[in-house]
Amino acid sequence: MAVQQNKPTRSKRGMRRSHDALTAVTSLSVDKTSGETHLRHHITADGYYRGRKVITK
């Protein structure tokens, strides 16, 4: 098993973790038919996508 030679510094740990931060959702769309807000390229909670009903309950 691999064992580290020296303890990584706080700086190296921070540099490794610098890309792990969560980002806010910035790409929201409003459906033409229902006016509901949803993620882009996803259907709404009502089952609409690009103005069409794609899922019926």
UniProtKB/Swiss-Prot annotation:
Region described as Disordered: 1-26
InterPro entries in the record: Ribosomal_bL32, Ribosomal_bL32_bact, Ribosomal_zn-bd
GO biological processes: translation
Molecular function terms, GO-annotated: structural constituent of ribosome
Domain of life the protein comes from: Bacteria
One CC-aspect GO term: large ribosomal subunit
One Pfam entry name: Ribosomal_L32p
UniProt keyword terms in alphabetical order: Ribonucleoprotein, Ribosomal protein
Similarity remark: Belongs to the bacterial ribosomal protein bL32 family.
Alphabetical list of HAMAP family matching this protein: Ribosomal_bL32
Name recorded for this polypeptide: Large ribosomal subunit protein bL32
Gene: rpmF
